[in-house]
């Protein structure tokens, strides 16, 4: 009776409590496991889903799921309780922020949604699941709340051409975790970084320094911020403004035909550039601007030109940084004195000198060629004449010799005949012989010597082998004849005798 009464007093809750106590005392899990994530990441302001799914044997039931925040060093704070019979119960601290996932729902799924996550929600959470009849299970996860940065770009001080290294801009971004800040630009410069860490976030500041120049004016300087909480990098662009003023120059005098008396539409234009944009002012050195001349910004327009418009005009370019001047001399000419009709003496002189130099060079070449041809022709003529005279002299000498050899009796007493070597009537001597004639029309020594040379150069037939005996007799006759002559000063003279002529049967010797 008491036992039955006690059994009737125990309800399902008592039996469940008993099973939990038995499971806790034994320290063993009967069956099943919890599936969750070690880390859940959510961007600030978005909903975070805290997963907790019980995977057990068929027939097991999840009675209730309890969520609590269990940060290190702090006690557990109840978040919510899900009961299979009574539904969801949320603690007052998270009222309106914790919900169940939208249907359909699995009875074994104990996940909850944390709406509109804030950075304070970052921490560690525990899921405790009570099942029947397996008992209770628990698992932990960490919630990470990403705080995307909101970058800001601050321009540096005004940039001026000629400055040294100057701050162009700084870019700051704060988030959790610390963001990455870089620069995207074609401008040459250097970047420096500084970071500051707070309790729940970190700030990064990057500065970009450069040396200003006019080429940088108008160039983009972009700050690029990267962060895990951003779907794509954030970019902030700053356009550089570098103050400068370029040199001034005046154009309009290139076509001199426009600057003649009576012409219209003549104008001068002042060229310059700067930042900020410059202003233009036209003046005239030798007085005020002539009447009718109008200045409109960088342009100075002239009416119908007259000689009074001649003068020196000055264009002054100014901006907040500096000012520049440029001047030109305007000379309005009469049509008769237009540059197109004037003779450029310098150019003409250069052309004349060039033409004269070319003509002289050509003349020099012609003279050299003609002189060369003349000397060549002269040399040929002299050579030909010399050969003709030499041939004629040889022919005369040979003809004379032939006439003497053909008839010795016809030779005049005044002449002296010299025979070539090898002739039976000649005198043979290794030295040159000279014969002086005593007749009034006798020949000189030089003439006889020349004849001797010519005769010697004349080729005569050499004696053959059959005339050897004649050669010996001739030599003997010469030896006998030499007994009657004496040699003085290179001349043969007859020895004093009663008869000055020696007659040999083989020939006549003088």
Curated annotation (Swiss-Prot):
Biased composition (Basic and acidic residues): 400-412
Gene Ontology CC annotations of this record: adherens junction; plasma membrane
Entry keyword annotation includes Metal-binding: no
Residue ranges crossing the lipid bilayer per the database entry: 350-370
Topology feature Cytoplasmic, residues: 371-510
Keywords from the UniProt entry: Cell adhesion, Cell junction, Cell membrane, Disulfide bond, Glycoprotein, Immunoglobulin domain, Membrane, Repeat, Signal, Transmembrane, Transmembrane helix
Residues in the signal sequence: 1-31
Gene3D superfamilies linked: Immunoglobulins
Limits of the Ig-like C2-type domain: 148-237, 248-331
Gene Ontology biological process terms from the UniProt entry: heterophilic cell-cell adhesion via plasma membrane cell adhesion molecules; homophilic cell adhesion via plasma membrane adhesion molecules; symbiont entry into host cell
Top-level taxon of the source organism: Eukaryota
Subunit and interaction comment: Self-associates. Interacts via its Ig-like V-type domain with NECTIN1 Ig-like V-type domain. Interacts via its C-terminus with AFDN. Interacts with TIGIT.
Protein name (record): Nectin-4
Organism: Bos taurus
Organism placement in taxonomy: Eukaryota, Metazoa, Chordata, Craniata, Vertebrata
Protein's gene: NECTIN4
């Amino acid at each position: 009776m008491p036992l039955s009464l006690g059994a009737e007093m125990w309800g399902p809750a008592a039996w469940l409590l008993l099973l939990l106590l038995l499971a806790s005392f034994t320290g063993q899990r009967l069956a099943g496991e919890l599936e969750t994530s070690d880390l859940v990441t959510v961007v600030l302001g978005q909903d975070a889903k805290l997963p907790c799914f019980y995977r057990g044997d068929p027939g097991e039931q999840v009675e209730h799921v309890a969520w609590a925040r269990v940060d290190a060093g702090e006690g557990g704070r109840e978040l919510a309780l899900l009961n299979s019979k009574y539904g969801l119960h949320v603690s007052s601290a998270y009222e309106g922020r914790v919900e169940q996932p939208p249907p359909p729902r699995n009875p074994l799924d104990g996940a909850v949604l944390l709406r509109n996550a804030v950075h304070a929600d970052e921490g560690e959470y525990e899921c405790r699941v009570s099942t029947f009849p397996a008992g209770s299970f628990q698992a932990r996860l960490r919630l990470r709340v990403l705080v995307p940065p909101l970058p800001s770009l601050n321009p540096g001080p005004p940039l001026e051409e000629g400055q040294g290294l100057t701050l162009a801009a700084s870019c700051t971004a704060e988030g959790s975790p610390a963001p990455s800040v870089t620069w995207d630009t074609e401008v040459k410069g250097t970047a420096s970084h500084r970071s500051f860490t707070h309790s729940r976030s970190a700030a990064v500041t990057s500065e970009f320094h450069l040396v200003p120049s006019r080429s940088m004016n108008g160039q983009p300087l972009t700050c690029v911020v990267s962060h895990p909480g951003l779907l794509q990098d954030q970019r902030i662009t700053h356009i550089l403004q570098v103050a400068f003023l370029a040199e001034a120059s005046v154009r309009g005098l290139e076509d001199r035909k426009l600057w003649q008396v009576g012409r219209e539409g003549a104008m001068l234009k002042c060229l310059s550039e700067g930042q900020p944009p410059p202003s233009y002012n036209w003046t005239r050195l030798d007085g005020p601007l002539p009447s009718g001349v109008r200045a409109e910004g960088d342009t100075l327009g002239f009416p119908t030109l007259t000689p009074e418009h001649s003068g020196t005009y000055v264009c002054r370019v100014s901006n907040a940084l500096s000012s520049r001047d440029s001047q030109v001399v305007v000379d309005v000419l009469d049509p008769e004195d237009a540059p197109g009709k004037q003779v450029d003496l310098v150019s003409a002189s250069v052309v004349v000198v060039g033409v004269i130099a070319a003509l002289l060079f050509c003349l020099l070449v012609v003279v050299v060629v003609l002189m060369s041809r003349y000397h060549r022709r002269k040399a040929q003529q002299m050579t030909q004449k010399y050969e003709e005279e030499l041939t004629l002299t040889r022919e005369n000498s040979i003809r004379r010799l032939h006439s003497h050899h053909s008839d010795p009796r016809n030779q005049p007493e005044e002449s002296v005949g010299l025979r070539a070597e090898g002739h039976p009537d000649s005198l043979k001597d290794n030295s040159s012989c000279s014969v002086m004639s005593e007749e009034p029309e006798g020949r000189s020594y030089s003439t006889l010597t020349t004849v001797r040379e010519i005769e010697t150069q004349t080729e005569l037939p050499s004696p053959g082998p059959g005339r050897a005996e004649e050669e010996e007799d001739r030599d003997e006759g010469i030896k006998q004849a030499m007994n009657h002559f004496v040699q003085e000063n290179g001349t043969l003279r007859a020895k004093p005798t009663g008869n000055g002529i020696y007659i040999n049967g083989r020939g006549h010797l003088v």
